[in-house]
């Protein structure tokens, strides 16, 4: 397939390289010339000019949009007038599911297919095999299922159903992630405050071999402690990107109790003023899987 890729940030540049590895043709677009040049050097076409970008694709076009949720509407406003009926937009960032439903309806009126694709696995997943949760019309899904099959890990993609369902699943996934990361951080803070002198890298390693709590997150915990044995180089500030808040808000709307997720969100807010070891662990984990910045001491 020939894919038009909009957004060549940490996730977009890596998914673009994986598309090429899987023998798909890629045309990249970003306002950052250096990012465009990097993808072109890997074998893609690319430009910083949106009209030129669209001209390098032929109907029916497939656009993969991977930009921060706050600029999706601006991207759609600029690109949709350049598209033709039957073209497709796959929005693979972290948008609120209600916004995805609204955008689906807008694009449907213009005759453009619109899929909302929740993407998990961080930068490594984007580069080597991700997890996808996709919502939208089944007719559109059938066209691009091979693309998701090629770029997902084995059994790592799901057609979730109607518009919005893909990003709804990703939202809840991220809420669960908040709770899991908080529990890992709290556990290591208890270790830090105990009378024992533990090697946290070794602790994370042994817990990740055969224990009930083994996981990719525990593996990333080991990796973080390998780089900084006591996380002395970073502050315990845990930033949040919105999905945990959306999960809690949705749970309140549905009158569904989510105390673990809600408290993990509250602790992230608290970390903006109080430096804790839990915060250091969570901040380090976010940096490991998503390249999210930590605040240095």
Swiss-Prot record:
Protein name listed in UniProt: Putative 6-phosphogluconate dehydrogenase YqeC
- InterPro entries the record matches: 6-PGluconate_DH-like_C_sf, 6DGDH_YqeC, 6PGD_dom2, 6PGDH_C, 6PGDH_NADP-bd, 6PGdom_BS, NAD(P)-bd_dom_sf, Pgluconate_DH
Q: Which PANTHER family does the UniProt record give?
A: 6-PHOSPHOGLUCONATE DEHYDROGENASE
UniProt-listed NCBIfam families = gnd_rel, PRK09599.1
Active site per database record: 170 (proton acceptor), 177 (proton donor)
Keyword Oxidoreductase attributed? yes
Q: What EC number(s) has UniProt assigned to this enzyme? A: 1.1.1.-
């Amino acid at each position: 397939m020939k894919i038009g890729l909009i957004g060549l940030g940490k996730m977009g540049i890596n998914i673009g390289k994986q598309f090429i590895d899987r023998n798909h043709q890629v045309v990249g677009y970003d306002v950052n010339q250096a990012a465009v040049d990097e993808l072109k050097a890997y074998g893609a076409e690319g430009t910083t000019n949106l009209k030129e970008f669209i001209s390098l694709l032929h109907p029916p076009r497939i656009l993969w949009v991977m930009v921060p949720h706050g600029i999706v509407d601006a991207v759609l406003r600029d690109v949709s007038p350049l598209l033709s009926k039957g073209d497709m937009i796959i929005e693979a960032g972290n948008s609120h599911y209600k916004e995805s439903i609204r955008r689906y309806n807008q694009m449907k009126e213009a005759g453009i297919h619109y899929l909302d694709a929740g993407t998990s696995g961080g930068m490594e997943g984007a580069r080597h095999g991700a997890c996808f949760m996709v919502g939208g019309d089944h007719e559109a899904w059938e066209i691009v299922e091979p693309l998701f099959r090629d770029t997902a890990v084995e059994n790592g993609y799901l057609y979730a159903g109607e518009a919005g369902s893909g990003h709804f699943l990703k939202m809840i996934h991220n809420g669960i992630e908040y709770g899991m990361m908080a529990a890992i951080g709290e556990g290591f803070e208890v270790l830090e405050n105990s009378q024992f002198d533990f090697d946290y890298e070794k602790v994370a390693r042994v817990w990740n071999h055969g224990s009930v709590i083994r996981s990719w997150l525990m593996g990333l915990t080991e990796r973080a402690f390998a780089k900084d044995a006591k996380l002395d180089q970073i502050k315990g500030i845990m930033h949040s990107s919105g999905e945990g808040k959306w999960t809690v808000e949705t749970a309140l709307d549905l009158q569904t109790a989510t105390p673990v997720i809600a408290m993990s969100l509250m602790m992230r807010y608290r970390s903006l003023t109080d430096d804790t070891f839990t915060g250091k662990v969570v901040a380090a984990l976010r940096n490991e899987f998503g390249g999210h910045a930590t605040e240095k001491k």
